[in-house]
């Protein structure tokens, strides 16, 4: 297995359904947000984070069946991730992301900020409707980490002497916290024990950090 596409093949159809559902959830009743959602979720991308949540959810299910709550958790994970990217692009004044126009360059900064805010709000609403306070705590922590990570990145933007541990800590806040806590949340929804919850958290954290280190290395090679 050499590609992300191969990795996510067992949940390929579920991911297609997820993107369609996200477009409907986010754009309903809001023409501008509908256009922004169509742009965001039609741009392709690996969909690695919701894909891993779906794979984990299937793996820990006795009958390898995804429940509606696990599917919604994957949608929430992608909403939070996408919202953070929209805001990051505004802060970084980036005109493209992986060859695709960013929301603020396609529309304007006001629409981008509001679209990101709306995604975070939608994620919070659907998170609350999972009716599981422990899952709410996990994903609420993620949103705090995202803001903290962005602040750390901007404070150390020109620090050429930044240590590897500081880089890892910043990367955890900006990206790894989301997949780590989402994987753990999948386990919480399945009612598995604390030891296995910790294993799910560590798996999500380490796979994301490894991905970020490799991605950064490829940029500088």
Predicted regions: what they are:
Residues 219-221:
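Conserved small/polar residues in nucleotide/adenosyl-binding loops
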Residues 178:
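Active-site helix-to-loop segments that bind/position phosphate- or nucleotide-bearing substrates
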Residues 52, 123, 149:
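Residue-level signal for inorganic ion chemistry
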Residues 1-82, 86, 90-105, 141, ...:
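Conserved N-terminal diphosphate/IPP-binding helix and adjacent helical/loop segment
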Residues 97-119, 161-175, 202:
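Divalent-cation-assisted or electrostatically stabilized phosphate/pyrophosphate-binding catalytic cores
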Residues 60-66, 126-138, 153-166, 170, ...:
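Inter-helical turn/loop segments and adjacent helix faces that build the functional surface
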């Amino acid at each position: 297995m050499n590609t992300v596409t191969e990795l996510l093949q067992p949940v390929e159809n579920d991911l297609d359904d997820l993107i369609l559902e996200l477009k409907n959830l986010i754009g309903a009743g809001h023409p501008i947000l509908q256009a922004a959602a169509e742009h965001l979720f039609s741009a392709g991308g690996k969909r690695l984070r919701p894909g891993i949540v779906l794979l984990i959810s299937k793996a820990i299910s006795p009958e390898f069946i995804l429940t509606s709550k696990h599917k919604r958790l994957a949608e929430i994970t992608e909403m939070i991730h996408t919202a953070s990217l929209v805001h990051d692009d505004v802060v970084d004044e980036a005109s493209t992301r992986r060859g695709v126009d960013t929301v603020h360059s396609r529309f304007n900064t006001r629409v981008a900020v509001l679209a990101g805010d709306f995604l975070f709000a939608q994620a919070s609403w659907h998170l609350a409707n999972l009716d599981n306070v422990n899952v709410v705590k996990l994903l609420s922590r993620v949103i705090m980490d995202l803001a903290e990570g962005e602040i750390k990145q901007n404070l150390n933007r020109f620090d050429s002497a930044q240590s590897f541990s500081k880089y890892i800590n910043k990367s955890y806040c900006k990206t790894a916290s989301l997949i780590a806590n989402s994987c753990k949340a999948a386990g919480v929804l399945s009612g598995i024990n604390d030891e296995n919850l910790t294993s799910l958290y560590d798996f999500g954290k380490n796979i994301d950090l490894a991905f970020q280190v490799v991605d950064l290395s490829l940029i500088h090679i």
